[in-house]
Amino acid sequence: MLQCKTSQQPIIDEQKTAITDTIQKDSLQVELLIPQDTVKQDSTPQKLTSRQLQLLKIEEKISCFQSLQKEKEINLKYPGKLLKKGDSGITIIPIKRKLQLLGLLKQDSLTIRFDSTMEAAVKNFQQMHNIRTDGIPGRNTFRFLSWPISKYINTLENYRENMSKKVDSLPTTLIEINIPEYSLRIYDNDSLLKQFKVIVGKYKTQTPILNSEVDYLVFNPCWTVPHKIAIKNMLPRMKRDTNYLDDRNMFITQNGTRVNHKAIDFSSCSKDNFPYKIYQNASPGNALGKVKFMFDNPYSVYLHDTPSQYLFKRDFRAFSNGCIRVENALELAQLMLNTDQNKAIIKNKLAKGYPVKVYLNEPVSIIIKYETVRYNEQLDLMQFFYDCYGLDK
C-alpha cells in the first residue's frame, strides 16, 4: 500500500501519555480527541475507538500524500486496450511510474515489461480503490490512476472534517451502509458480523442519507411499482406487448380495485393519463426477491433482495431507483432475527408463498451514509471510492 513512515497502531496508556489528548508520531502530531476521564487510572492499555483510529489514519495519509506533491504529477489516460502480465511496450512505463509514486512498486522496476511484480502492484492499487483485484488495469482502474495527488488530499481532508463532527458512541447492533463503497456492514456488540455488497440508487434516483431503525422484515414481498417506473419503463412495453404483465406475474388496480388489464387500451394512456397501480406478486422473479427490510423514512426506501445477483459482480453498482439491493439478503435476515431457529423460521415463512411480516424483537439501527474514503481496519488499508453522486466537493 502507500508507503509512509509510521509507527505501530497506538494505544492509550496512562503511564506513557501522562493523560494527554495528543500522540506524537515521528514528526506528526495527531489530535485524538480523548477526554481525560476516559483514561483508566491503571497501566491497562485502552484501545482507540473506531472514530479515533479513523482520524489517526487520516492524518497519517494526508501527511503521506502531501509529501508526494513535490513530485512531478503523472497524468494517465486509458490506452484503449487491456494490458496484462506478459505484455510489453512504452505504455507500461507511465503506469509503473504512478504505482512507484504511490509506493506500490519498487524504484528499480521501471521496465517496459508487465511482469508479476507490476501485476501485484496493480492488484494492491485496485484493492486500495475497492474494485476487482484482477491485476489488469482496465477502464475502472484507470479511472483512479488518473487521480492527481491533490484529489487524494482533498478527499481525505473532507473526510477528516466529517469525522471530527461525529460521536464515538454508536448503537451496539447496527446496519451501516456506505453508498460510494456499495457496501453494507452489520455489527453486534460493536463487532463486525458480516459485510455484504449492495446496489444503490442511480445518479438521478439517489439513495438518501439517513438514520433510522429496521422494525420488521417481509418474506415473499409483493412489489408495488412506483408510479414513475410504471409510466416511464413499463407503459411503453405494455403498449407493445399484451402479455407483458402476465409474463411477470403482475396485476393492476384502479381506485383500490383489481381490474382486468386485458380490457385496458394502453395505447390511450400517457404519463398524464395513467390512473392505475401495478403490483408484482410474490414469485421467484419478483423484483424484491425473497425478503425486504422495512424502516421508517420519508423517502419510501428500504433494503431488499434481488433475483439479479449477477449485478453484484460489477465494480460500480448504482443501478436502482433509490432502494438498496442486498447480495445474499437471506443471510442478512438470519443475522437480524438472531435466534437459534432463524433458519427454520425463514424456511417456514418462504414456504408459505405469500407475503409474511416478521417483527424483530428489538429494532436494529440503520445508518446510510456517504463517505468516499474509509480506513479498513480488517485490511489495515485506507480505501478510496468513486464519488458516484458528486457530493464530495
Model-derived segments and their meaning:
Residues 5-36, 40-105, 113-119, 123, ...:
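Well-ordered beta-sheet/strand-loop patches within structured domains
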Residues 1-2:
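Sec-dependent bacterial lipoprotein signal peptides
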Residues 132-140:
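Short, well-structured active-site flanking segments
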